[in-house]
Structures are given as structure tokens and as C-alpha cells.
């Protein structure tokens, strides 16, 4: 999503070679240092993209992390944040694929229109939350903590989770 109430969905096939072709079309956007990337748990998205050789660059804004900075004692999932800040009930993932367990479906099992609606809503709600939480960070004088301390740790954690950490046991 690049504007509120407007989002796009590009299906990525399971076949890695075909998926890589699509990911490479968007590589310049992800690796553009001059554009902000917004996500809900953006670390997860960065790890997925890193698996395709994409290094996300530029300023980052994670709505989950922003809310953690503002109210660490509360839940930070998108469904909760949308209800609290936007007064909006999102499409819950378990409504589409079922509860965790052996009978849970994959997103690939769903009709494309269901995935489209879910993915576009996810992107749009995330951007709307960013716009609200950004103001809250400013109001609570938490911008420095968020932008200068918390967000710079995200790429570090991506690398640690992807590559591991060497430990000198001696």
C-alpha cells in the first residue's frame, strides 16, 4: 500500500525460480534507500526477502514495534491494533485457513480472491496504523527511542536469525 485505502496484491508462486522472477521485479523498491518500508512485524518480511537475496534498505517502520514502544504491556498483533486505533475488525487469518493443527490450510489452498482481500487489507491496515502510531510516538516523545534505538536493531536481528551467531565457548 502506498496510500490509505489503496493496496495491491501480487501473487508469488511456490516454485522458487518463478517466485524469484517476481521478487526481482520489486527488488529496486525494497533496496531503495530513499523510501520508507512499513510493516507489521517487518522483521519477518525482511527474512523472507533475504531468502531471495533481497537486502531491504532505507528507513523502516514496524507498527508492532511502535506499539511495543508506546504500550509494552499490551498485545501488539494487527487485529488488536486495528480494533483499538482504527475501530476496524480485520479479516482474521484463522477465518481463512482455520486454527493451528493438522487440519489448518495453507494460503495457497484458498481461492485467489480470498487471498487478495486478506493481503490488501493487511497492507492497508498496516499503513493506517503507521500513520496513527507515528503521531502517538511524537505525542509521547518516543520518536528517538523508536527510530534511533529500536528500529536499527531490526536488520541486526534479521541477520542473527538468518545467519546465527558464533559463540566462543573458551
Residue ranges of model-derived segments:
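Active-site-proximal helix-loop-helix substrate-binding element of RNase H-like nuclease domains
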Residues: 2-138, 149-153, 157, 162
